[in-house]
């Protein structure tokens, strides 16, 4: 264990802001736990179909306020992207070279996931698994990939958006919601908010990289102002309280993003900035620093494969021939919640198996003289540029 800590420490560049690494680690843990807690695969109808405890227990909506951490991802992504592009320009790296390297790093682990699931889907269909079941599983696996598409687009636009004030995309989201909700406009307009909505925290991250957002007053303004605006939109404007999608709900705050999701993201960004000070004090011990670094090095693998891990456990559980509580049953009560909490360590163990099989696609190929290239994929990996980790 001590040797692992020393290796991770030696691979960590000096001067790194470990608080940013810790923010990213908290964000990825929130996404993984959030999906595991609000996604159920029910087997009560002869097929496998998705369900959510938020359908049956809407009072659990406040849990989504803690587990939906996408704004933090885009905040950190904007900070890392803007700083990385500025550093690349200082070294004489062209925009095409900088962007190409980042997109290649994003695409490598995604390609592995798509290839595995293309084969798995074909095998299931040949084996006679119903198309509805295969569709449910593929939807769970592929739906998180929208995040990477948006992130790749914002990364490509980094030189253009680094100087954009967040109020501009907020104004776009406001007008889109006003037209589609207030004036009965077409629902497809909401997809404009996919870019505009997540551009808000990305722009905040870019401002952070330029030296802004350093004072606590700004952070408190974002937190309190965003929270107050979100509360007002939920209480008096009819927006859903849940910050994650709920099957069967007429309106989703996240698919596509609404004004409530954007104001909630502002509050999250404010909270994240306020946490920077405490987070810089927490990883004072080498073991704690190594744990944060390890989560960051595995962030992309965890993001891409955590749903697969949950589905693998669900499939193995079906071999018992009965519906296991918290795994195959309808999420309609506190009994299901408690049972699902008990399954989390099993999901984590399955994710470790996925990590062992696929983390090399995230960390890159081994080079000469025993070195391995550790990939930095913007928001889903630690700060800085590619460096080499001595094996």
Give, region by region, the residue ranges found by the protein language model.
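Alpha-helical transmembrane segments and their immediate juxtamembrane cytosolic regions
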Residues: 2-391
């Amino acid at each position: 264990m001590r040797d692992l800590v020393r290796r991770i420490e030696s691979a960590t560049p000096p001067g790194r802001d470990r608080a940013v690494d810790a923010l990213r680690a908290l964000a990825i843990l929130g996404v993984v736990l959030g999906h595991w807690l609000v996604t159920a695969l029910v087997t009560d109808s002869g097929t496998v179909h998705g369900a959510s405890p938020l359908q049956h227990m809407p009072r659990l909506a406040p849990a989504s306020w803690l587990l939906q951490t996408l704004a933090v991802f885009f905040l950190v992504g904007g900070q890392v992207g803007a700083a990385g592009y500025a550093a690349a320009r200082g070294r004489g790296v062209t925009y095409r070279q900088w962007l190409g390297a980042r997109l290649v790093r994003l695409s490598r682990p995604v390609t592995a996931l798509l290839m595995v699931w293309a084969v798995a889907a074909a095998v299931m269909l040949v084996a006679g698994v119903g198309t509805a079941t295969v569709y449910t599983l593929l939807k769970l696996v592929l739906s998180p990939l929208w995040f990477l598409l948006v992130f790749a687009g914002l990364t490509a636009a980094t030189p253009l958006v680094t100087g954009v004030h967040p109020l501009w995309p907020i104004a776009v989201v406001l007008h889109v919601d006003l037209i589609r909700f207030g004036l009965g406009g077409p629902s497809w307009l909401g997809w404009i908010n996919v870019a505009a909505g997540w551009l808000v925290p990305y722009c905040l991250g870019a401002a952070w990289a330029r030296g802004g957002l350093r004072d606590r007053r700004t952070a408190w303004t974002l937190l309190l102002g965003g929270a107050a605006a979100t509360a007002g939109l939920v209480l008096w404007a009819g927006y859903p309280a849940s910050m994650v999608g709920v099957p069967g709900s007429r309106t989703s705050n996240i698919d596509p993003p609404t004004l409530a999701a954007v104001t909630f993201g502002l509050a999250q960004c404010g909270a994240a900035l306020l946490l920077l000070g405490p987070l810089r004090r927490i990883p004072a011990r080498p073991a704690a620093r190594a744990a944060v670094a390890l989560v960051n090095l595995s962030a992309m693998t965890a993001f891409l494969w955590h749903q697969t891990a949950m589905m693998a456990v669900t499939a193995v559980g079906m071999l018992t021939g009965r519906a296991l509580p918290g795994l195959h049953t309808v999420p309609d009560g506190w009994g299901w919640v408690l049972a699902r909490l008990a399954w989390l360590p099993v999901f984590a163990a399955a994710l470790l198996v996925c990590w062992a099989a696929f983390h090399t696609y995230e960390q890159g190929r081994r080079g000469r003289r025993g070195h391995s290239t550790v990939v930095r994929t913007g928001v889903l990996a630690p700060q800085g540029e590619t460096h080499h980790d001595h094996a």
